[in-house]
Amino acid sequence: MALAATGCMSRGESNNSESSTTADLEISVSIRGSEAPTKSWTLHCPPGGTLPDAAAACSKLGQIDDPFAPVPEGTACTQIFGGPEIAAVSGTFNGKRVDTEFSRGNGCEIERWKRVGFLFPGVS
């Protein structure tokens, strides 16, 4: 999925703290149209898993309202391309099922990617 470079979404900061954030996530990033290997991580909150700096990731996730929400249907988005990467996130977050993809195919998707970009280390 594509990274959103413009502020198409208006989701604020959450009152959650790292200690109240629970997650059991599988994260992968692949490059559309490439034979490059897929990069994969796990994230568990309380902090654990293979994602670098899991403690910071748990803390950041706890500060974002609905970090895995899709771009609302009907949203007008700028038509810019942010890159061929596609990120998939699945598992549970704060007791809710997560099964979503992120891309950088338009401005809204770029912004959505940027909100949780810390989950995709090494992907610019």
Whereabouts are the PLM-identified features?
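Sec-dependent bacterial lipoprotein signal peptides
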Residues: 1-6
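Extracytoplasmic
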Residues: 22-24, 38, 84-86
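Beta-strand secondary-structure signal
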Residues: 24-28, 42, 88-90, 99
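Post-signal peptide N-terminal segment of mature Sec-exported envelope proteins
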Residues: 17-33
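Extracytosolic low-complexity repeat regions of secreted or lipid-anchored proteins
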Residues: 76-124
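N-terminal first-folded block
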Residues: 28-50
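Bacterial signal peptide processing site
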Residues: 7-12
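Mature extracytoplasmic domains of secretory-pathway proteins
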Residues: 44-89
